[in-house]
Design a protein with these regions (language model features):
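Short, positively charged and aromatic/hydrophobic N-terminal segments
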Residues: 10, 18, 22-23
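Conserved N-terminal subdomain of the carbohydrate kinase-like
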Residues: 27-143, 324-344
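Short pre-catalytic strand/loop immediately N-terminal to key active-site residues, enriched for Gly-Thr
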Residues: 38-39, 252-273
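Conserved phosphate/ATP/ADP-binding segment of small-molecule kinases
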Residues: 144-252, 264-267
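Short, small-residue alpha-helix embedded
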Residues: 171-172, 268-292
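Charged C-terminal helix
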Residues: 293-344
């Protein structure tokens, strides 16, 4: 099929500017290494939806295929670890390159080694790697994973430019006690932030001493965003969710949003896919040229609106959140709004 420039005689509502004068920036491309779940609106479903809305091409590499995400009582998981090396080889043969790489759920500890090989080939200078270390929630490691998987994920976390753990995953990665951390800080977000920073600095210093892989992210380069921390606003007394942004230098930012009723239980259990959506928005917004603090604020606002709709409809948490109707929040600023006359 051959497509010709539109004729103003046929479509008078279109702009009179010559077709050849319309210039578009080169589309950016990310590799998304994540599972594909038939139910739950998470992982690759989230990655593809977010990146596409933000004008970024997604090259999908499934780490596993599931009938539903693992929160459902009955599901089947097909491990695709053995295929990761095939994707690496074939994409390398095709000469592909990426502006961003995102990794999420891995079905086995061996998958981390395969992703490391992928990074060896594609995580070049100028490529931003975001690791969303899917390990656990509510103080517990997911039952499908174990210490070997956690140790494997630490290797990827050390290489990431951006790391987006929830509080449980942060503790698992840096071998801190979740319960003791909450007990010591007693709901004080400022105290918790300082404790997280101390744990992170200590862990990174230990990594620097024992590091044999010179491809690990430098202290200055890596940014960690600890997501979904339940908190209490001192001024209003309202329950909030806080995201802390830190690096080796200190706490560099934070964002907070009101907790919407059943959005998060007292135990911290959240809706399926929120971490995936958050990570995808942050990575894509950074690739669009925004600062990390702005990217986190956008992701927080997007999730807040989506969760509010989901709570109103009393959707089961395993089903994910109703984010699709809010994707317009993520459209690139360079794209003009559609006018009524543009649609025939």
């Amino acid at each position: 099929m051959v497509l010709f420039p539109p004729s103003n005689a046929l479509f008078p509502a279109l702009s009179p500017a010559p077709f050849s004068c319309i210039l578009f920036p080169m589309q950016k491309k990310i590799a998304a290494i994540n599972d594909l779940s038939g139910l739950g609106k998470c992982s690759l479903y989230a990655d593809i939806s977010i990146a596409s809305a933000m004008g970024i091409e997604v090259c999908s590499l499934p780490s596993a295929i599931l009938t539903s995400q693992t929160g459902y009582r009955d599901y089947c998981c097909t491990d695709f670890t053995y295929q990761i090396s095939t994707y690496t080889e074939k994409w390398s043969n095709l000469g592909l390159s990426f502006q961003g790489i995102l990794s999420g759920f891995l079905a086995s500890s061996d998958a981390a080694d395969e992703v490391c090989e992928f990074l060896e080939r594609f995580h070049s200078k100028g490529t931003l790697y975001l690791c969303d270390p899917v390990l656990g929630d509510n103080g517990n490691c997911f039952f499908t994973l174990g210490e070997r998987q956690t140790a494997a994920m630490r290797k990827l976390a050390a290489r990431a430019d951006i790391l987006t753990p929830n509080l449980t995953e942060f503790c698992l990665l840096y071998q801190a006690s979740y319960e003791e951390l909450l007990r010591q800080t007693a709901g004080d977000t400022e105290a918790l932030a300082e404790e997280l920073l101390s744990i992170y600095r200590h862990a990174r210093s230990a990594e620097a001493v024992s590091a044999t892989d010179d491809r690990s992210s430098t202290d200055e380069a890596q940014t960690v965003i600890v997501t979904g921390i339940p908190s209490l606003n001192r001024n209003t007394g309202e329950k909030e969710m806080v995201n802390l942004i830190l690096n080796q230098a200190g706490i560099i930012g934070r964002s907070s949003t009101k907790r919407h009723g059943a959005e998060v239980s007292e135990q911290g259990t959240s809706y399926s896919g929120t971490g995936d959506l958050f990570a995808a928005v942050v990575l894509c917004d950074l690739l669009c040229g925004r600062k990390i603090e702005d990217a986190v604020r956008l992701a927080t606002a997007f999730l807040s609106r989506s969760v509010a709709d989901t709570v109103r409809e009393e959707t089961d948490r395993n089903g994910g959140i109703h984010f699709e109707t809010h994707l317009s929040m993520l459209l690139p600023e360079s794209v003009p709004p559609t006018r009524p006359g543009d649609l025939l």
